[in-house]
Design a protein with these regions (language model features):
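Subunit-assembly interface segments of extracellular/virion macromolecular structures
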Residues: 1-217
């Protein structure tokens, strides 16, 4: 699961989207709560209607100054624990970078991740890059089938010059090359009642936040 933190679009008169990319992997601290967290991801209302506000996805690492508060508080200001640069501007450690919205600013979301590896799909070994997908941005009671969406395409020598005849170690651009079937797999989600699996390989099934089916690659 991810901890979701909704922030206001502006801070000190600056549009926070101009530096949100630089915040990935950086630590932040709540000015009033003292809670410390690391930013793993950021999503925007432009990413889809499910995102109501600019949302930071964080992992909390330190509880508050009273050792009781474990998450940021509504409306509080966030302080940068690292240093970032965007354009010609530097925000140093100890400076403020954002403020939480005034109500219902924090929640727990659900996420599924897959590590880098090789899957055997349709008779072919397919390399899969490390990736994650947020199932629901503000709740951890999600219900989905999660797996890999498969894209098959024919790649010709015109698309990939490495497919031209390279006898004796030299590319012969006058000789036709062999076309190849390219399979790409992307982590994706489907509703539980969507059983159209022509281009989908299910890996895990989640119902109301609980794992019901887990398939090994």
């Amino acid at each position: 699961s991810y901890s979701a933190v909704k922030i206001n679009p502006d801070h000190l008169g600056i549009d926070v989207t101009v530096y949100t990319k630089q915040l990935h992997g950086k630590s932040i601290r709540g000015q009033s709560s003292g809670v410390v967290a690391t930013i793993d991801d950021c999503r925007f209302p432009t990413d889809g209607p499910e995102y109501t506000d600019i949302t930071l996805y964080v992992n909390y690492s330190t509880s508050g100054t009273d050792n009781e508060v474990s998450s940021f508080e509504d409306g509080e200001i966030l302080i940068l624990e690292d240093t970032i640069t965007y354009g010609n501007t530097t925000i140093s450690s100890g400076e403020t970078i954002a403020s939480l919205i005034s109500e219902d600013a924090t929640s727990t979301s659900s996420i599924v991740s897959v590590g880098e590896g090789v899957f055997f799909i349709r008779g072919t070994f397919v390399n899969i890059q490390k990736s994650s997908i947020i199932l629901d941005p503000y709740t951890n009671t999600s219900s989905y089938r999660v797996g890999l969406t498969i894209l098959e395409e024919i790649v010709s020598a015109k698309d990939d010059k490495s497919l031209y005849d390279n006898a004796k170690g030299f590319s012969n651009f006058a000789a036709p090359g062999a076309d190849r079937l390219k399979i790409t797999a992307t982590l994706s989600k489907k509703s539980l009642n969507d059983n159209d699996d022509k281009t989908f390989v299910e890996l895990i099934r989640i119902d109301n936040g609980e794992i019901k089916v887990l398939k090994e690659s």
